[in-house]
């Protein structure tokens, strides 16, 4: 059975000292779900964009990266609102899940 490839993505907020460890944990959670992390994708911001999680320019860079790698799934470090997930899925043309959904898949 072929593994699904994903991009693990997160926003590093200024006050987050454990960001690298959190991203490693996200990758481990993905692997526990049988996913293959093709790449990590990050952005440093003072706070997450309330509409789209990433800034608009960085979101378009993520879209380009998905196309280059032929990856159709993104997992996010932080819990997102349904509106953020919809905006990202519409912009990226990819399935987007947050950390909480990933954990629920492990225990399903």
Description of each model-found segment:
Residues 1-105:
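N-terminal accessory targeting/assembly segments
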């Amino acid at each position: 059975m072929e593994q699904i490839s994903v991009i693990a993505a997160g926003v590093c907020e200024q006050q987050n000292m454990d960001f690298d460890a959190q991203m490693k944990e996200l990758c481990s959670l993905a692997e526990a779900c049988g996913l293959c992390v093709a790449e990590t994708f990050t952005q440093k911001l003072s706070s997450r964009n309330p509409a789209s999680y990433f800034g608009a320019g960085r979101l378009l860079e993520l879209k380009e990266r998905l196309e280059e790698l032929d990856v159709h799934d993104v997992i996010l470090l932080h819990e997102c609102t349904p509106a953020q997930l919809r905006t990202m899925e519409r912009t990226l043309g990819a399935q987007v899940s947050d950390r909480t959904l990933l954990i629920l898949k492990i225990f399903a």
